């Protein structure tokens, strides 16, 4: 993680050195015009086929979190279907909070295509032994969805009108990756190395 963090920070420094305007664009992210979650998932499903094996027609639906639960749930989540039916494949979107539609687009890449929805349906089509459904790993499942977020940022570039769209989305992903590395280093430092959160100097050396 340290090497990934160092590499990402170096890349960001080089990008901002060559294009200082990217920093302003990063904080004032361009919006995707005519954005709709359903069309975004269709677009992601189409785009991912150049990087991942295509699925047969996959039925899914979008639902919205009830307002009574908006303050307690994630911005979006994929609801894993029952084992014996494999359906419905449902993505819930939380309309609470303020986020750009570009952020929602990349969140849908995490939850939908090529993220959790794709991961679950593809896995089911491999006809795994039943025991594989009993043994699961949150790190494995979330690791995949986080990994493919980088593709979501790439796919979003063609939907932005800015000439530097590819660089903007690449910088956004690097920023996301840096944050994930920092969170992970703090997590392992505090819970594995038992560094107390009140020891900022030691935490900084993780």
Name every feature range the model reports, one short phrase each:
Residues 1-87:
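Active-site-proximal, well-structured secondary-structure segments within enzyme catalytic domains
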Residues 2, 34-41, 97, 101, ...:
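Solvent-exposed, acidic/flexible segments
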Residues 6, 13, 38-45, 90, ...:
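Extracytoplasmic/secreted envelope proteins and their assembly/folding machinery
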Residues 11-18, 61-62, 164-178:
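Acidic/histidine-enriched alpha-helical segments
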Residues 93-108:
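Short pre-active-site segment immediately N-terminal to the catalytic Zn-binding motif
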Residues 112-126:
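Catalytic Zn2+-binding segment of zinc metalloproteases
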Residues 119-121, 130-165, 183-187:
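Post-HExxH zinc-binding segment in Zn-dependent metallohydrolases
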Residues 195-206:
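Single conserved hydrophobic/aromatic residue that forms the stacking wall/gate
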């Amino acid at each position: 993680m340290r090497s990934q963090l160092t590499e990402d920070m170096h890349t960001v420094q080089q990008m901002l050195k060559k294009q200082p305007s990217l920093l302003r664009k990063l904080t004032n992210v361009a919006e995707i015009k005519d954005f709709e979650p359903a069309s975004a998932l269709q677009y992601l499903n189409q785009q991912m086929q150049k990087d991942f094996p295509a699925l047969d027609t996959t039925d899914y639906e979008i639902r919205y979190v009830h307002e009574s639960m908006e303050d307690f749930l994630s911005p979006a989540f994929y609801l894993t279907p029952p084992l014996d039916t494999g359906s419905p494949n449902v993505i819930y979107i939380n309309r609470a909070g303020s986020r750009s539609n570009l952020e929602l687009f990349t969140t849908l890449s995490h939850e939908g295509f090529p993220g959790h929805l794709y991961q679950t349906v593809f896995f089911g089509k491999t006809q795994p032994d039943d025991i594989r459904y009993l043994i699961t790993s949150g790190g494995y499942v979330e690791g995949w969805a986080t990994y493919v977020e980088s593709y979501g940022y790439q796919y979003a570039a063609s939907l932005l009108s800015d000439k530097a769209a590819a660089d903007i989305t690449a910088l956004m992903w690097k920023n996301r990756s840096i944050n994930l590395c920092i969170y992970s280093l703090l997590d392992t430092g505090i819970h594995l190395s038992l560094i107390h959160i009140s020891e900022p100097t030691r935490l900084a050396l993780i």
